[in-house]
């Protein structure tokens, strides 16, 4: 059960949306469609994520497995400018210092064992700035991010960094 919870947490880390922007990540006035959580919400940013999901080789009563530790990554607008960075526990900090904490409220089906799942996060923002008022974040269209093989006794305690790309869409 512990292994499943850890795997699900890790799977929930990626995203991309079908909303347009003018290159700076600001989304033209559109409302979200798709999952129930974002239906009717307004998409305001759509940034691409590049980074790594970090896992540690751990052991429990079922054997060795890769335990999710944290993401490391940056969120870029369509011109490649850094807009935010991913933080521990699904947090995000924007370039202006505003930040949000997030918790998973919805996840999509597995598209591939190697790819993170689509996930919807409910958020709490802190500080004034570009993330102020963001209520939801959806991570979509992830490529990579998941370990493909289990770890062994000789790897216990070692870290594994799995590259990923995704799209993060922010909603008010």
Regions found by a protein language model. Name each.
Residues 1-4:
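Positively charged n-region of N-terminal signal peptides that target proteins for export
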């Amino acid at each position: 059960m512990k292994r499943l919870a850890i795997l699900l947490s890790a799977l929930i880390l990626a995203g991309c949306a079908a909303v347009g922007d003018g290159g700076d990540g600001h989304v033209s006035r559109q409302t979200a469609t798709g999952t129930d959580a974002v239906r009717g919400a307004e998409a305001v940013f759509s940034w691409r994520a590049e980074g790594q999901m970090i896992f540690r080789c751990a052991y429990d009563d079922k054997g060795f497995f890769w335990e999710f530790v944290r993401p490391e990554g940056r969120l870029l607008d369509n011109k490649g400018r850094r807009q935010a960075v991913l933080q521990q526990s699904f947090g995000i900090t924007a370039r202006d210092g505003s930040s949000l904490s997030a918790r998973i409220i919805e996840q999509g089906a597995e598209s591939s064992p190697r790819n993170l799942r689509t996930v919807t996060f409910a958020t709490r923002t802190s500080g004034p700035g570009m993330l102020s008022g963001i209520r939801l974040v959806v991570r979509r269209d992830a490529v990579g991010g998941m370990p493909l093989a289990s770890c062994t006794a000789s790897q216990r305690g070692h870290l594994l960094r799995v590259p990923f790309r995704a799209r993060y869409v922010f909603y008010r």
